[in-house]
Amino acid sequence: MAEAKAAREAEQERSQAVAATTVDAIWTAGGAASADHPYLARKGIAANGARVTGDGRLMVPLYGAEGDLASVQYISADGEKRYHPGGATGGKFWMLGEPSATIYIAEGFATAATIHQATGKACAVAYSASNLVPVTGALRERFGAQQDLVIVADNDASGVGQRYAEQASAKYGAR
């Protein structure tokens, strides 16, 4: 049982390492996104350093706490989102802006970009409600107990975002 688990974890790490290498090449080859990309224009947000693939999909990066590129999320013109196959996502984020006294944490890129544009404050893209807890933990570890972390969850009818935000807040002392 333990051997099988160790083998699965080793395979996952290998797959994630391969994906990270591939993603790095794709990210480097991509062009800078412009404000007229259909997704950005529809959301009314700046590119914030996002890139585009050769076929026009927006690429937004997922970094580890130490700044290592782990994966990308591809966003089509109509807003369909897909992660790069095999890439790590848990605890990975993208920091928009320079961290200061307060860091916001949002579920998705559009929400984070809107917050960053409206406040001028740093906002981490967690990419999903379920990633709010690990991202908050990674930021708490990186910036310490005194860092003001503010979670901005989606207000979905299901309440999923709020539940994960409450868990992250309770576990890591975020607001």
Where do the PLM segments sit?
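Acidic beta-strand-to-loop metal/phosphate-binding motif
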Residues: 146-156
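Phosphate-handling DNA/RNA-contact segment within nucleic-acid enzymes
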Residues: 57-145
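Short acidic, S/G/P-rich loop/turn micro-motifs used as interaction or catalytic elements
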Residues: 130, 156-158
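Structural alpha-beta junctions
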Residues: 121-122, 144-146, 167-175
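Short, aromatic/basic amphipathic alpha-helical patches
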Residues: 139, 160-172
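TOPRIM metal-binding catalytic domain and adjacent DNA-binding surface shared by DnaG-type primases
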Residues: 1-59
